[in-house]
Amino acid sequence: MAGAKEIRSKIASIKSTQKITSAMEKVAVSKMRKAQMRMAASRPYAERIRQVIGHLANANPEYRHPFMIDREVKRVGYVVVSSDRGLCGGLNTNLFKALVKDMAVNRENGVEIDLCVVGSKGAAFFRNFGGNVVAAISHLGEEPSINDLIGSVKVMLDAYLDGRIDRLSVVSNKFINTMTQQPTVEQLIPLVATPDQELKHHWDYLYEPDAKELLDGLMVRYVESQVYQAVVENNAAEQAARMIAMKNATDNAGDLISDLQLIYNKARQAAITQEISEIVGGAAAV
């Protein structure tokens, strides 16, 4: 029964692992719901800033903020939002594939690249892959704060204002639904014009201080809020991916336990049959 003992030990080990993955799945569900709430709460802020920027720009067409001016692209910047932990399926791998593909297009056109990396997995990836990482931050926790991101974002904004980069994009996972997380590369600055029905209406605003100074401040806040939104949404996507990965692991463990249990029963039956045969054979010899 040596083989049966090994199988029994393996079954016990897999059951122990199954309990862990099942618990991690439940924790991921709880964290995902909280992340979804933070995601929903932060979205209106960024959208309202975008609307006010549009009103200000329309009301003051003579002033063009640097973040609204297109220029020849010689160097680009990426804010790469990854997770701090693994066990979330192919979430980070798919994100890095999308980023590398976009970077390859820029390099083919002779465009140089600077990187701002959010998350430990992104930092580890670029240590191996290579890349000019000019800013990095990690271990933001389950409830990231926009204040934690301001320093790293400022590095990229200053680079844009100084002319060291000509375009800035954010790379993150979009939370489509519980089963779908989509890696995306979105341009932050120069600001991409989007059709907004509200801008067609007349808004009688009084700006204090003047509209130019207000626009300068709002532009920075807008970029910061977009990066924060990407971090919060990526966190929700991470928890959803981890929930799915742990559920699959739990289900696979159950299948493996069933297969091993069948093998164990067959081995035990064979051992019992052999013992009976030996007893019968011994009795016949007597």
Curated annotation (Swiss-Prot):
Listed transmembrane segments: none
Gene Ontology annotations for the cellular component aspect, listed alphabetically: plasma membrane; proton-transporting ATP synthase complex
Location in or out of the cell: Cell inner membrane
Predominant location: membrane
Pfam families: ATP-synt
CDD domains linked: F1-ATPase_gamma
Alphabetized GO MF terms: ATP binding; proton-transporting ATP synthase activity, rotational mechanism
Keyword terms of this UniProt record: ATP synthesis, Cell inner membrane, Cell membrane, CF(1), Hydrogen ion transport, Ion transport, Membrane, Transport
Membrane topology of this protein: Peripheral membrane protein
PROSITE patterns membership: ATPASE_GAMMA
Any one biological process term the GO annotation gives: proton motive force-driven plasma membrane ATP synthesis
Family statement: Belongs to the ATPase gamma chain family.
Self-association state and partner proteins as the record states: F-type ATPases have 2 components, CF(1) - the catalytic core - and CF(0) - the membrane proton channel. CF(1) has five subunits: alpha(3), beta(3), gamma(1), delta(1), epsilon(1). CF(0) has three main subunits: a, b and c.
Function (record text): Produces ATP from ADP in the presence of a proton gradient across the membrane. The gamma chain is believed to be important in regulating ATPase activity and the flow of protons through the CF(0) complex.
HAMAP family named in the record: ATP_synth_gamma_bact (MF_00815)
Protein name: ATP synthase gamma chain
Native species: Pseudomonas fluorescens (strain Pf0-1)
